[in-house]
Design a protein with these regions (language model features):
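A short, mixed-charge helix-start or loop-turn motif at secondary-structure junctions
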Residues: 1, 30, 144-146
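Active-site mouth loops of central-metabolism enzymes
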Residues: 1-12, 33-39
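Short, acidic/polar
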Residues: 6-22, 43-46, 68-75
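Active-site groove signature of glycoside hydrolases
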Residues: 19-40
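Beta/alpha (TIM)-barrel catalytic core signal, keyed to glycine-rich beta->alpha loops juxtaposed to Asp/Glu
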Residues: 36-146
Length: 146
């Protein structure tokens, strides 16, 4: 996981930190987690391609980014003949199926895999928690916005 945005400096720092902690030379899959609303798609693509070509990562994916931004990345990668995102990671459960509107068609169109996070809706679907308790907790505490 990285903090500080999607610019090259922050992504490389996150990558090197992960490699060090995992005591490995490369990652099979590097997630760009959360779009920063600032970094142009072209810049992010260049950074990710450089990481792949350097042998630091084999593949990369996007988590919690707008569908239009991921589509732009995938299109640029296709046109340029460079490695684009191969997977998407988003909140997806029986409680919230918003992913089906834009992101699943995007994944299908560009041949990307989809990895859901919190498929049990922060535990709500286990039956262990009451919906009002989960909603009241808010997203930071493991709840969700209704």
């Amino acid at each position: 996981m990285h903090t500080g945005g999607n610019g090259a400096k922050h992504l490389y720092a996150a990558l090197e930190g992960s490699l060090r902690r995992l005591r490995t030379d490369y990652l099979d899959l590097f997630w760009v987690h959360v779009w920063d609303s600032v970094t142009p798609a072209e810049e992010l693509l260049e950074t990710m391609v450089a990481m792949v070509r350097a042998g630091k990562i084999r593949y990369w994916g996007m988590s919690n980014a707008p569908a239009w931004y991921v589509a732009k990345l995938a299109t640029l990668a296709s046109v340029r003949g460079v490695p684009g995102p191969i997977a998407l990671q988003y909140f997806y459960s029986l409680v919230n199926r918003d992913l089906e509107d834009e992101h699943l068609p995007l994944a299908k169109e560009f041949g990307m895999g989809v990895v859901p996070w919190s498929p049990l809706a922060y535990g709500l679907l286990t039956g262990k928690y009451d919906r009002s308790v989960v909603e009241a907790a808010g997203p930071r505490a493991g709840g969700f916005a209704a």
